[in-house]
């Protein structure tokens, strides 16, 4: 692709952060966050593979099964869903049924209508598992509108972060009978910021509740996993200057959602109508390509090489060929600093999860090592995933662990190579020939072998 200008900006000195949504190919929707013309985050959703998990439906009970302590419900999809009795809020029980010792056959009857949320996707011949205890994920909080006893702080938040969040949450205002969970993205957020998120969730719940009461029969009320809505919820913040969308239907969806939850920033949602394709206009197609390639080049000539193994992801940092008279320590340190930025970016683009080990170029001076550690920390600050670090060890390795946010990019679009089974190597000609001769020998020794036929490549 074309060389990126070193300042990463467009010709007009454009440094605005933007969210770009490309949906011109009906089979795939792509989301990119760009800073000027530098791609900083990327996500894709393939038609027919959307998740239903988190979706909310109006459902009708079709069969009550006392032996399973559950009922089956029609929720508007092909197969009926499975709703265990313990997942049914007592607000849905028939009049006069004691909530304490109730049996499902007394509390629920065929034809009852309920509001349900998908907990587990359907798999194979099993229907989806449902619950009536809805949870709505916001950016910093999860609201449980009909579950008074579900609240707290995400288990992954520890120490003083936990205390601070609890204090902030005690200041929030919301109706009785609801509860809240703080998400990890809420760490370090003030009570007003949390309240802003909560107000959006309360509005959303009102809208869902209203739609459920208004409509008849079984139907989808709220689609959790529409890429657009998730993107605005999880990525949008004040420093994103505009959201550009290149198809009408997705634009309408985003506009409607924004007007509903953040009317003051709704004008930032814009319909992109230029002749040049949206992603080409911001020169990010070739940057997306780097998210699929093993080697990623750095600005001053070095590169990083990313390999997946069973146990971990390894990232090797290589410097450019050293020219005479250059200071080796300085080259090493500069390459490592560039690598730190690129590694943080690739973690996000590829959504690398689990254990990641980086082999930096060896540096003698400890202040340079600290500087590289700090640079990586800063670069990962804007990551939505939770990341933990070690420092650079005496062998020049740095370990980090990163939470997985979604199925990895490569899982969605790549398969293991059927020839090498993912090792990247197959036997060379000589080795193959010898192995085949051994097999021929072994087969021909057997009593009942009349002839041995071997299919081999020409060279072998």
What are these regions (language model features)?
Residues 1-51, 58, 62-63, 78, ...:
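Intrinsically disordered, low-complexity mixed-charge segments
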Residues 150-154, 177-183, 209-220, 240-246, ...:
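Interdomain boundary/hinge elements
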Residues 12-55, 141, 164-166, 170, ...:
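Extended, charged alpha/beta regions that create polyanion-binding interfaces
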Residues 67-71, 75, 79-80, 121-145, ...:
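Conserved glycine-centered short motifs in functionally critical loops
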Residues 53, 154-161, 186-200, 217-224, ...:
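Catalytic cores of large soluble enzymes that bind and process phosphate-bearing ligands
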Residues 101-193, 197-210, 217-218, 222, ...:
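Accessory, often N-terminal, substrate/partner-engagement and coupling regions
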Residues 111-113, 216-217, 268, 312, ...:
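Loop/turn-to-beta-strand initiation segments
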Residues 42-44, 48-68, 98-122, 161-168, ...:
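Phosphate-interacting basic helix/loop segments used at nucleotide- and nucleic-acid interfaces
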């Amino acid at each position: 692709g074309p060389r990126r200008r070193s300042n990463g900006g467009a010709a007009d000195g454009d440094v605005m952060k933007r969210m770009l949504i490309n949906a011109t190919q009906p089979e795939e929707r792509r989301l990119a966050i760009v800073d000027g013309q530098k791609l900083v985050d990327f996500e894709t959703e393939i038609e027919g593979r959307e998740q239903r998990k988190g979706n909310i439906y109006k459902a009708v009970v079709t069969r009550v099964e006392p032996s399973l302590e559950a009922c089956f419900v029609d929720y508007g999809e092909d197969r009926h869903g499975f709703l265990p009795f313990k997942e049914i809020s007592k607000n849905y029980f028939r009049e006069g049924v004691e909530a304490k010792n109730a049996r499902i056959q007394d509390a629920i009857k065929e034809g009852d209508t309920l509001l349900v949320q998908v907990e587990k996707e359907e798999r194979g011949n099993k229907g989806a598992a449902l619950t009536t205890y809805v949870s709505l994920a916001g950016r910093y909080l999860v609201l449980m509108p009909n579950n008074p006893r579900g609240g707290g702080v995400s288990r992954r938040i520890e120490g003083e972060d936990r205390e601070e969040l609890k204090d902030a949450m005690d200041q929030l205002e919301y109706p009785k009978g609801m509860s809240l969970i703080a998400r990890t993205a809420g760490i370090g957020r003030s009570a007003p910021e949390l309240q802003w998120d909560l107000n959006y969730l309360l509005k959303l719940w009102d809208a869902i509740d209203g739609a459920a009461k208004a409509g008849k029969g079984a139907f989808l009320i709220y689609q959790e996993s529409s890429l657009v809505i998730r993107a605005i919820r999880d990525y949008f913040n004040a420093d994103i200057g505009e959201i550009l969308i290149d198809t009408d239907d997705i634009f309408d969806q985003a506009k409607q959602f924004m007007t509903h939850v953040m009317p003051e920033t709704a004008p930032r949602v814009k319909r992109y109508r230029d002749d040049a394709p949206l992603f080409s206009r911001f020169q990010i197609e070739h940057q997306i390509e780097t998210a699929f390639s093993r080697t990623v080049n750095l600005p001053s000539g070095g590169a990083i090489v990313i390999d997946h193994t069973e146990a971990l992801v390894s990232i090797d940092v290589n410097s450019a060929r050293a020219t005479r008279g250059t200071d080796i320590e300085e080259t090493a340190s500069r390459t490592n600093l560039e690598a730190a930025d690129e590694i943080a970016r690739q973690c996000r683009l590829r959504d690398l999860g689990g254990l990641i080990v980086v082999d930096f170029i060896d540096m003698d001076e400890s202040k340079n090592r600290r500087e590289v550690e700090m640079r990586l920390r800063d670069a990962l600050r804007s990551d939505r995933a939770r990341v933990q670090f070690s420092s650079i060890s005496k062998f020049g390795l740095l370990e980090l662990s990163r939470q997985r946010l979604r199925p990895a990019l490569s899982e969605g679009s790549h398969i293991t190579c059927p020839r090498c089974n993912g090792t990247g190597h197959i036997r060379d000609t000589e080795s193959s020939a010898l192995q085949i001769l051994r097999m021929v020998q072994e087969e021909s020794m057997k009593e009942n072998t009349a002839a041995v036929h071997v299919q081999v490549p020409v060279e072998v």
